[in-house]
């Protein structure tokens, strides 16, 4: 970097601030003379120049520090987001490995994975409730039996869902003569993923 050759600046000595207005000192001429105006002008210019440089450099340091903080915060945020996505993808992969599906050569998409998982859970719930004849072992406790309550709650949800599907089907002009079982729906869905993927 090239530097300019500048002559050294002369600094004015600090003025005695305790001198009285009428008192004349070598550094401070008597008020009313033309010299005091010159001294005031020099002092204000040097104060502005030195103070101005300090403020500008402080501003530069401040804005540079803010930029560095902003960049650092952004990098940390990006790293947190990267870790979050990595954990999410690992969880999806673990779910893909647990859900039975036919095609192992092609990875299921996230929406396919979630849909299959939801339907698989529904089919397992229906199977368990059917096999246990509305009683779940291990849930029996003194008082009212929780097995039938769970069974009733499940059937209530299924009825609501079927009603919503019927309303949606009626709006679209589609009618279902016979509702499919959960396992049959699940196997149909697996087959459609196999054919479509």
UniProtKB/Swiss-Prot annotation:
Residues 72-124 form the bHLH domain. InterPro entries: bHLH_dom, bHLH_transcription_factors, HLH_DNA-bd_sf. It is found in: Nucleus. Its main location: nucleus. Pfam families: HLH (PF00010). The keyword Cell cycle does not apply. Keywords: DNA-binding, Nucleus, Phosphoprotein, Repressor, Transcription, Transcription regulation. GO terms for cellular component: nucleus. Coiled coil: none annotated. SUPFAM superfamilies: HLH, helix-loop-helix DNA-binding domain (SSF47459). Plays a role in controlling the transcriptional activity of MyoD, ensuring that expanding myoblast populations remain undifferentiated. Repression may occur through muscle-specific E-box occupancy by homodimers. May also negatively regulate bHLH-mediated transcription through an N-terminal repressor domain. Serves as a key regulator of acinar cell function, stability, and identity. Also required for normal organelle localization in exocrine cells and for mitochondrial calcium ion transport. Lacks a classic transcription activation domain and instead possesses an N-terminal region capable of inhibiting heterologous activators. This is Class A basic helix-loop-helix protein 15. It comes from Mus musculus (Mouse). The lineage of its organism: Eukaryota, Metazoa, Chordata, Craniata, Vertebrata.
């Amino acid at each position: 970097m090239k530097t300019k050759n500048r002559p050294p600046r002369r600094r004015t000595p600090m003025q005695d601030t305790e001198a009285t207005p009428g008192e004349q000192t070598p550094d401070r001429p008597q008020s009313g003379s033309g010299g005091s105006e010159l001294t005031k002008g020099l002092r204000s210019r040097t104060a502005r120049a030195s103070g101005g440089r300090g403020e500008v450099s402080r501003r530069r340091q401040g804005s540079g520090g803010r930029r560095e903080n902003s960049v650092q915060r952004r990098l940390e945020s990006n790293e947190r987001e990267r870790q979050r996505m990595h954990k999410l993808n690992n969880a999806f992969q673990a779910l893909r490995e647990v859900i039975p599906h036919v095609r192992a050569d092609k990875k299921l998409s996230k929406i396919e994975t979630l849909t299959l998982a939801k339907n698989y859970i529904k089919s397992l719930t229906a199977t368990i409730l059917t096999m246990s004849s509305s009683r779940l072992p291990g849930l029996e406790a003194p008082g009212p039996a929780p097995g039938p309550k769970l069974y009733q709650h499940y059937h209530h949800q299924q009825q609501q869902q079927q009603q919503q599907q019927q309303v949606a089907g009626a709006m679209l002009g589609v009618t279902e003569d016979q509702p499919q079982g959960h396992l049959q729906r699940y196997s149909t869905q697996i087959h459609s993923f196999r054919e479509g993927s």
